Amino acid sequence: MEKGFTLVIPLYNKVKCIRYTLDSVLNNHGSYPFRCIIVDDDSTDGSSEIGEEYDVKYPDVFQYVKIKHHGHKTPVNARNLGIKLAETEYIGFLDADDELCAGFIDRGCTFLDEHPEYSMYGNGLTLRVLDENGEIKETTRNYSTNKINNFIDCLFAGAQDISFCASVYKTELVKDNLFTDNFCEDSIFKLKYIYKNLPIYIDNSTCESIVWNRQYNESYKWNVKRTNDSIIKEVFLTLKNELPGFKYEYEFINDETVVLYET
């Protein structure tokens, strides 16, 4: 693996916002050796032309790849192709409607260079949503823990809730931990990675990683209405199926309290 960082952006029909995303990458990727792979999952709304445009105008930064299979599949295929194409030591992900913050990649890669015992570096993030009046509101989401050495601590610290995009991973480990096509595929990916590759480090000194845009996402209101019970049930079932020897269980005490334990 060569020194550097690869950012993978899966793209499908995001013509309204993809320029904002790519401009944030162009302006904020920092000084660490860097490459951004845009994997287009057969867009039909003009997003493809924008991806090609940035590839041509900024060939030292962007690589545009289009999957042609006559119909959108899922982000899983696009992300996995980006992983397979990555040749740098570190890798990360950004959704096509989110934005990259200045300093995040340099900060994460430098930390992992200096602390090779950790497999992942994560930050808090900024969440941008539309309120009931249609106005854009921003809040930050951060976490109280730094070093995480075991899986239960990871869950209690909320490390699985930090957007998987707000993290820097080691590429050679990610290549052995591809995305699978199931519910909460991003959380499943991150939990599997953490389970296999502890310890990880959460830098709670800043939320400057990504801007998680949800003013474009019509499904977000539906997603936040799902109960914790149903989400945890589906996630744990998937982990048991995909991780041989997975030895953790959970039990709800009431609507707000869940007990996690090792079997």
Where are the model-predicted features located?
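A conserved acidic beta->alpha catalytic loop
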Residues: 24, 40-50, 95
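Conserved donor NDP-sugar-binding/catalytic core segment of glycosyltransferases
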Residues: 103-137
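Short, flexible, basic/aromatic active-site loop/helix in glycosyltransferases
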Residues: 69, 124, 138-159
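Short, well-formed alpha-helical segments that are part of the catalytic scaffolds
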Residues: 14-27
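Short beta-strand/loop segment that forms part of the nucleotide-sugar
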Residues: 33-42, 63-68, 96
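Conserved nucleotide-sugar donor-binding catalytic segment
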Residues: 147-228
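Short aromatic/hydrophobic "clamp" motif used to bind/position activated sugar donors
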Residues: 91
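Glycine-rich, basic loop-to-helix element that forms the pyrophosphate-binding segment
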Residues: 68-86
